[in-house]
Amino acid sequence: MIVVSNRKELDELIKQRISEQGFNCYLNDIDVSRVTDMSCLFKDSYFNGDISRWDVSNVKSMSFMFEDSMFDGDISSWNVSNVEFMRSMFRDSRFNSDISRWGTSN
């Protein structure tokens, strides 16, 4: 497991993986539990890999995270209960997966 402490480290690692393995690369071996900001992370991206096991329970902002992206993976099990900002998270993206069980009361 690769532990990242902040958004910058995560962004750099994702760019490296996509460069080496392509847009369907596996990212579930990255521990993102310390990251609090994922805004614009995959914005304008062709990424469509597996991030289903990410622990996003400490994330506060996911605004524009997948805007204009090709992502359509299964993220239904994400714990988004602490996310405060989801503005335009999936705006103009290909995302069409079921997230109806997300607890978004925050």
What do these predicted ranges mean?
Residues 1-106:
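Negatively charged
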